[in-house]
């Protein structure tokens, strides 16, 4: 199973608006065995013979919290230029769709966001937010999606999503760490859910880049994790990760555990 998605020259039709399943990402073959470093980092390599594109995917422990960093880089190892209009990690095989229980058990948590109404979190059944409840088996063409255009990356939604399986008692969560255009897609493939976080693409952001032989392009930074429990447990793991990442040497977490932001919430920006 590929743990990335890359695309070039894709046909853009309505039923192909989901980001997964395009060439050459769909047909790339793995190169060698995954490389594991100290039990905290794993690297996968893929190659497409037709285009000469090579993709390197690295997952590594973030240090605090049940969170992984995902890095994806595509390099043109061929002899001709190749234009890339989508590159991103993808987290497949998350929760089973084989039984009909997912219709009542799978919840999606997401946050609408504007300047005067920040972090408005919603808890919805995923079948009510884009995923077809009549899905039977195999791949589903329906999906849940958030997106943002431009440099105000939280203008409509926070670049985060939590997929909660209440039947299994676990949650998967993902955060895009980027200040430009992005999209977050949750769908079904091979009887399981996937999460696909992405930076700007040709469809979302009018972005593409032509790679000459030897040139590379990297995906936007992404954090991903899985934990037992629901929304609160997922947010707790992301909070541990953020505090350790933003303030790695600060002892204020023990002495000052609350961060109070009065910019918009109290002073109305005055």
Q: What label would you give each PLM region?
A:
Residues 72, 225-237:
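Short, surface-exposed, low-complexity cationic segments
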Residues 84-87, 209, 229-234:
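OB-fold single-stranded nucleic acid-binding module
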Residues 209-228:
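Short Pro-Gly-centered flexible turn/kink motifs
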Residues 233-270:
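An acidic-aromatic substrate-binding cleft motif
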Residues 192-212:
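Short acidic, Pro/Gly- and aromatic-enriched capping/linker segments at domain boundaries
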Residues 1-189, 205:
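Polysaccharide-binding surfaces and accessory modules of carbohydrate-active proteins
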Residues 72, 214, 260:
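Conserved, mostly hydrophobic/aromatic
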Residues 179, 224, 263-265:
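Active-site beta-loop-alpha junctions enriched in small/polar residues
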